[in-house]
A protein has these predicted regions:
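Polytopic endomembrane small-metabolite transporters, centered on the Drug/Metabolite Transporter
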Residues: 77-79
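Asp-based, Mg2+/Mn2+-dependent phosphohydrolase catalytic module
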Residues: 2-14, 22-24, 28-31, 35-39, ...
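Conserved phosphate-binding loops in N-terminal lobes of ATP-dependent enzymes
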Residues: 43
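Receiver (REC) domain active-site loop signature in two-component systems and cognate sites
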Residues: 18
Length: 328
């Protein structure tokens, strides 16, 4: 019997929202899949752009859901932001917090002083997601940023998956300050590589697999870090958006969910421009991908991705082909 996909890796660096849970609820099957990693001898780390909670709070939530999680296994964008600002500012520098108490805590841990008003003369602004942020908070940040202060965003995710649907993420709030000031922040979290390198180092991993639901953060960040990436279909991105992905956001593997880690990934072969995966096949010509297989068969989408990405290897923007489906 062929080896499972996970057998080629010594660790999983997993995203949270859209991979492990959506809103307050675990994604079906996700907890069991995470629990199984230990029996397979694979280490587990969580890499998240959620800056509204501390790593300890994130780990506690994961344990409530039944997932295996210790505090040190969680690496957040708020931690990355704290480390970045500490490397750029003198100890004791004042930093305006446009975000959560958890973000303020991370800033304090690195020897900086969190403040809440432009009147306190901060030399930097750090902006992270907090569902309670309002106009006054964004105005305070804008005053300080416009005055020339260093501006750091924990992440620029434009959306965040919730139980009721897709909601605006931190990137939308960052964009409001950018529109008001004409400035651009430095970004500490995904899709930048250091967050992934830090997580892999903590796990002493040489062969990590990055698993995420978002091309623009998880997959792009994992690719930038030089790690193997897998996209799951339990969150934001879909089969269609993954097929259309720009080159640097294309995953190495396409999975339905975390349970697919434990099955053999089908081999994809190139037969003179026709790409075969399982019983499905696909070829690309003149912006059209012709797929032989069923639309609900993931192997058909894997073949379609292989064909399209081979035909358009250097896509700087997302570009979707026209799909033509044929039955066997």
């Amino acid at each position: 019997m062929a080896d499972s996909l996970i057998s080629a890796f010594d660790a999983v660096l997993s995203d949270l929202d859209g991979v492990v849970y959506t809103g307050p609820h675990a994604i079906p099957g996700a907890v069991a899949s995470l629990q199984r990693l230990e029996t397979e001898g694979v280490r587990l780390g969580y890499v998240t752009n959620n800056a509204s909670r501390t790593p300890a709070q994130v780990a506690a939530h994961l344990r409530e859901l039944g997932a295996p999680a210790e505090d040190h296994q969680v690496v957040s964008s708020s931690q990355a932001a704290g480390e970045l600002l500490a490397s750029l500012l003198p100890a004791g520098a004042r930093v305006l917090i446009t975000g959560s108490a958890a973000l303020a805590h991370e800033i304090e841990l690195v020897g900086l002083v969190p403040v809440s008003s432009a009147a306190e003369n901060p030399v930097a602004v750090v902006q992270g997601f907090n569902p309670e942020i309002g106009w006054k908070d964004l105005a305070e940040a804008s005053y300080v940023v416009a005055g020339g202060a260093l501006w750091c965003a924990t992440n620029t995710d434009m959306t965040i998956p919730q139980a009721r649907g897709i909601a605006p993420g931190n990137g939308v709030l960052v964009a409001a300050v950018a529109a008001a000031t004409g400035k651009t922040p430095v970004v500490a979290g995904k899709p930048e590589a250091p967050l992934f390198h830090t997580a892999a180092k903590r796990l002493n991993s040489d062969r990590p697999l990055v698993v995420g639901d978002r091309l623009d953060t998880d997959i792009l960040g994992g690719n930038r870090a030089g790690f193997t990436t897998a996209a799951v279909l339990t969150g934001v991105d879909t089969k269609e958006t993954i097929l259309a992905a720009r080159s640097d956001e294309r995953p190495d593997y396409l999975l339905a969910d975390l349970a697919d880690l434990y099955v053999t990934y089908p081999q994809i072969t190139d037969d003179g421009g026709t790409f075969r995966c399982g019983a499905a096949s696909a070829h690309a010509h003149d912006g059209i991908v012709t797929v032989t297989g069923a639309e609900d068969d993931l192997d058909a989408w894997r073949a379609a991705c292989a064909a399209w990405w081979s035909a358009v290897p250097d896509a700087s923007t997302a570009r979707a082909p026209r799909l033509e489906w044929r039955r066997h």
